[in-house]
Amino acid sequence: MINWQVLGQLIATGTIMLAGPAVIVLLALKKGNL
């Protein structure tokens, strides 16, 4: 069986770790363009 709770936590953690830097880069680019 697949432990969906653990799988969900891993996906959520991975998404946050990837999305954090991406948001910072996007904000930096937007400020740079202004």
From Swiss-Prot:
GO terms for cellular component: chloroplast thylakoid membrane; photosystem II. The keyword Ribosomal protein does not apply. Pfam families: PSII_Ycf12 (PF05969). The chain crosses the membrane at residues 9-29. It is a single-pass membrane protein. One of its GO terms (biological process) is photosynthesis. InterPro entries: PSII_Ycf12_core-subunit. Keywords: Chloroplast, Membrane, Photosynthesis, Photosystem II, Plastid, Thylakoid, Transmembrane, Transmembrane helix. The keyword Membrane applies. It comes from the Eukaryota. It is found in: Plastid, Chloroplast thylakoid membrane. A core subunit of photosystem II (PSII), probably helps stabilize the reaction center. Belongs to the Psb30/Ycf12 family. PSII is composed of 1 copy each of membrane proteins PsbA, PsbB, PsbC, PsbD, PsbE, PsbF, PsbH, PsbI, PsbJ, PsbK, PsbL, PsbM, PsbT, PsbX, PsbY, PsbZ, Psb30/Ycf12, peripheral proteins of the oxygen-evolving complex and a large number of cofactors. It forms dimeric complexes. This is Photosystem II reaction center protein Psb30. The gene is psb30.
